[in-house]
């Protein structure tokens, strides 16, 4: 699988759907190593209705989720993991450096530094216009579909 990936290719790798699919395209992809993706943040995002009326700001937890989805594309592009679910196992060192607002292109870079069996870890960075918006260590566990509620 080679970048760039558009919405159809992303949906083949991830189970997320609107309104919770938070990646519009994957610009760079090294399966199991690294992925770079973009979310074009529009005024029409459903979360802006309540966060915050008159002062729309993308919730920080959704920035972290978007980074995790980019990382999941990087993992799910590896044949061994395709079709599994990547579930959050932990989030460390989260820092928000800049607000993300309508009109921003949120560029997310995830380096996967551990991928072994049923667990993985990556370092996510998110930028708007070259300015760092967020950073986090992302830990995840893999489940077979149908196993995630156990």
Curated annotation (Swiss-Prot):
Its main location: cytoplasm. GO terms for molecular function: (3R)-hydroxyacyl-[acyl-carrier-protein] dehydratase activity. Keywords: Cytoplasm, Lipid A biosynthesis, Lipid biosynthesis, Lipid metabolism, Lyase. Transmembrane segments: none annotated. It is found in: Cytoplasm. NCBIfam families: fabZ, PRK00006.1. Involved in unsaturated fatty acids biosynthesis. Catalyzes the dehydration of short chain beta-hydroxyacyl-ACPs and long chain saturated and unsaturated beta-hydroxyacyl-ACPs. The active site is at 51. It comes from the Bacteria. This is 3-hydroxyacyl-[acyl-carrier-protein] dehydratase FabZ. The keyword Lyase applies. It is an enzyme of class 4 (lyase). Belongs to the thioester dehydratase family. FabZ subfamily. It comes from Rubrobacter xylanophilus (strain DSM 9941 / JCM 11954 / NBRC 16129 / PRD-1). GO terms for biological process: fatty acid biosynthetic process; lipid A biosynthetic process. It catalyses: a (3R)-hydroxyacyl-[ACP] = a (2E)-enoyl-[ACP] + H2O. Its EC number is 4.2.1.59. Gene3D superfamilies: Hotdog Thioesterase (3.10.129.10). One of its GO terms (cellular component) is cytoplasm. PANTHER family: 3-HYDROXYACYL-[ACYL-CARRIER-PROTEIN] DEHYDRATASE.
């Amino acid at each position: 699988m080679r970048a760039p990936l558009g919405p159809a290719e992303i949906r083949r790798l991830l189970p997320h759907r609107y309104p919770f699919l938070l990646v519009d395209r994957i610009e760079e992809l090294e399966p199991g190593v690294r992925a770079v993706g973009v979310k074009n943040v529009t005024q029409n995002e459903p979360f802006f209705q309540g966060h915050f009326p008159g002062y729309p700001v993308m919730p920080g937890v959704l920035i972290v989720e978007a980074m995790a989805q980019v990382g999941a594309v990087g993992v799910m592009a590896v044949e061994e993991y395709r079709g599994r679910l990547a579930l959050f196992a932990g989030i460390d060192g989260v820092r928000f450096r800049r607000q993300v607002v309508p009109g921003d292109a949120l560029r997310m870079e995830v380096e996967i530094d551990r991928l072994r069996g049923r667990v993985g870890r990556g370092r996510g960075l998110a930028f708007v216009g070259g300015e760092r918006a967020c950073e986090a260590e992302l830990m995840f566990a893999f489940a077979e579909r149908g196993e995630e509620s156990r």
